[in-house]
């Protein structure tokens, strides 16, 4: 076994453990900076050690190839952005906060490379357990404690469902290795027990993604958790789970399951965008609103993925990348607002007080809504094109209607910024965070000029599936 190939994972877990010990010596700000630095180093090592050919370390517990390394890179970049927001923000939590983020990042990068039901479940739990603590990290806030308890309770239920699905899959096949499962499913008739087991595993994944009808936890947890945690929840775990689902359905891991899963995935993705569109209409809390928004965006990604074509896969990844950039840009401002009072009213009148900031926030919101010629428009255009080319015209119309409805709540925020009276809330504006917001906004503006290049790059990565 070449130890160079597993150096990113090795460095990630060792650096997390070392920083956990160093927290006793150094102050929390230093640990936060070191956590950011270690994640950047992990990304650099990953880039330098990446290879096109497949590699199966630890007796095939993991699989490493170009697609998996690219997915891990996306996860680490999203994690770096959240850690950057943490270092630039008002938050002064205990040093364990950034360490928990490092542990969950390690769980995510091993999750997307898992090649065995056991390694997959262990990675899934290593990703999940720190998230429970992060959601309830603000002990002084009853909302944060409530969010942690709700998330833990429902996540435990979803983990049990997933574990039961894995036991069914093992019981009917006698296998746990993904490659061996693929060969078994290709050469044997699919029984209802196997299909039911796979459905239960999918339910567990859909819960973490907050896909309808397993979305009920998201609005309460997003609202109650510290805003920096909400920023993490809405981006990094979604990157990990979406990239794993792409490998799950489009790779060699599970062959022949498309006909069983396509109708289900299409229906729940349509349900997600409709619940998102109507559920967010009456929300005045920004974090609850973005929770419903994320349900809809993941619905778009899942719809494109459920087509089971290369174009659909590429479109879902483009959408994911643009969604992460836009979300980070929005949260770079929202984390400056009080965690327990993150309402739309706090944005009232900033179009007059801080016109440049309001402009950049408007660009990001327009992109979220899919207004041309911003990056969000092209992301949705690729999704619609994938659906139409595959013959799902009726489904495309549902998504178009949901997109039009969702424009209302994005525009209501812009209306508050420019036309409502300035609020009395005292927000301490950070110049550093303003730069993050501006960069995310500018990326959304200029990306339409090179969206084809991004598509070609993603297509090159997915060819290795």
From Swiss-Prot:
Disulfide bonds: none annotated. GO terms for biological process: ATP synthesis coupled electron transport. One of its GO terms (cellular component) is plasma membrane. It is a multi-pass membrane protein. GO terms for molecular function: NADH dehydrogenase (ubiquinone) activity; NADH:ubiquinone reductase (non-electrogenic) activity; quinone binding. Signal peptide: none annotated. NDH-1 shuttles electrons from NADH, via FMN and iron-sulfur (Fe-S) centers, to quinones in the respiratory chain. The immediate electron acceptor for the enzyme in this species is believed to be ubiquinone. Couples the redox reaction to proton translocation (for every two electrons transferred, four hydrogen ions are translocated across the cytoplasmic membrane), and thus conserves the redox energy in a proton gradient. It catalyses: a quinone + NADH + 5 H(+)(in) = a quinol + NAD(+) + 4 H(+)(out). Its EC number is 7.1.1.-. NDH-1 is composed of 14 different subunits. Subunits NuoA, H, J, K, L, M, N constitute the membrane sector of the complex. It comes from the Bacteria. It comes from Wolbachia sp. subsp. Brugia malayi (strain TRS). The keyword Glycoprotein does not apply. The keyword Membrane applies. The chain crosses the membrane at residues 6-26, 30-50, 66-86, 98-118, 156-176, 194-214, 226-246, 261-281, 289-309, 317-337, 363-383, 391-411, 432-452. Belongs to the complex I subunit 2 family. It is found in: Cell membrane. This is NADH-quinone oxidoreductase subunit N. Keywords: Cell membrane, Membrane, NAD, Quinone, Translocase, Transmembrane, Transmembrane helix, Transport, Ubiquinone.
């Amino acid at each position: 076994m070449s130890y160079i190939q597993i150096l990113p994972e090795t460095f990630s877990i060792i650096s997390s453990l070392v920083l956990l010990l160093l927290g006793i010596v150094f102050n929390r700000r230093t640990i936060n900076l070191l956590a950011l630095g270690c994640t950047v180093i992990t990304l650099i090592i990953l880039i330098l050690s990446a290879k096109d050919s497949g590699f199966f370390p630890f007796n095939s517990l993991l699989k490493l190839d170009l697609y998996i390394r690219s997915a891990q890179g996306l996860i680490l970049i999203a994690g770096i952005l959240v850690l950057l927001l943490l270092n630039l923000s008002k938050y002064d939590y205990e040093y364990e906060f950034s360490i928990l983020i490092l542990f969950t990042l390690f769980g995510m990068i091993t999750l997307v490379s898992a090649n065995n039901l056991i390694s997959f479940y262990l990675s899934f739990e290593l990703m999940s357990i720190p998230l429970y603590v992060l959601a309830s990290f603000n002990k002084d806030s009853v909302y944060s404690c409530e969010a942690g308890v709700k998330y833990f309770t429902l996540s435990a239920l979803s983990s049990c469902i997933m574990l039961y699905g894995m036991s069914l899959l093992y019981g009917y096949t006698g296998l746990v290795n993904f490659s061996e499962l693929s060969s078994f499913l290709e050469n044997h008739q699919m029984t209802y027990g196997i299909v039911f087991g796979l459905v239960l595993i999918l339910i567990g994944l859909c819960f973490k993604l907050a896909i309808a009808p397993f979305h009920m936890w998201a609005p309460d947890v997003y609202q109650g958790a510290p805003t920096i945690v909400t920023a993490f929840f809405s981006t990094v775990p979604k990157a990990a789970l979406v990239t794993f689902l792409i490998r799950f359905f489009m790779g060699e891991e599970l062959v022949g399951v498309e006909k069983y899963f396509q109708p289900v995935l299409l229906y729940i993705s349509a349900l997600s965008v409709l619940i998102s569109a109507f559920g967010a209409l009456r929300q005045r809390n920004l974090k609850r609103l973005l929770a419903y928004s994320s349900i809809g965006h993941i619905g778009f990604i899942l719809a494109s993925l459920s087509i089971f074509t290369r174009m659909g896969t590429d479109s879902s990844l483009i959408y994911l990348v643009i969604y992460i950039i836009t979300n980070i840009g929005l949260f770079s401002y929202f984390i400056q607002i009080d965690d327990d009072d993150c309402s739309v009213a706090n944005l009232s009148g900033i179009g007059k007080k801080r016109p440049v900031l309001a402009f950049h926030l408007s660009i990001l919101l327009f992109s979220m809504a899919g207004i041309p010629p911003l990056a969000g428009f092209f992301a949705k255009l690729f999704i619609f094109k994938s659906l139409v080319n595959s013959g799902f015209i009726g489904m495309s119309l549902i998504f178009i209607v949901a997109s039009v409805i969702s424009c209302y709540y994005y525009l209501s925020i812009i209306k508050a910024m420019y036309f409502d009276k300035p609020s009395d809330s005292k927000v301490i504006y950070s110049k550093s965070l303003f730069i993050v917001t501006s960069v995310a906004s500018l990326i959304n503006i200029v990306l339409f000029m090179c969206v084809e290049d991004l598509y070609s790059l993603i297509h090159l990565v997915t060819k290795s599936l």
